[in-house]
Curated annotation (Swiss-Prot):
Entry's family note: Belongs to the gliadin/glutenin family.
Keyword entries, A-Z: Disulfide bond, Repeat, Seed storage protein, Storage protein
Additional remark text: Glutenins are coded by several genes on each of the group 1 chromosomes of wheat.
Molecular function in Gene Ontology: nutrient reservoir activity
Protein name: Glutenin, high molecular weight subunit PC237
Subunit structure: Disulfide-bridge linked aggregates.
Entries under Pfam families matching the protein: Glutenin_hmw
Keyword Zinc: no
Protein function: Glutenins are high-molecular weight seed storage proteins of wheat endosperm. Thought to be responsible for the visco-elastic property of wheat dough.
Domain of life (superkingdom): Eukaryota
Length: 39
């Protein structure tokens, strides 16, 4: 049986990895919008 602490830690890591994966795409989108707006 997986302990609650272990489950919570795994969930936190998964969330952090998900955020880390989304950040570059978000930055690229915002950067692209800013570039197209300035032109």
């Amino acid at each position: 049986l997986v302990s609650v602490e272990h489950q919570a830690a795994r969930l936190k890591v998964a969330k952090a990895q998900q955020l880390a994966a989304q950040l570059p795409a978000m930055c690229r989108l915002e950067g692209g919008d800013a570039l197209s707006a300035s032109q």
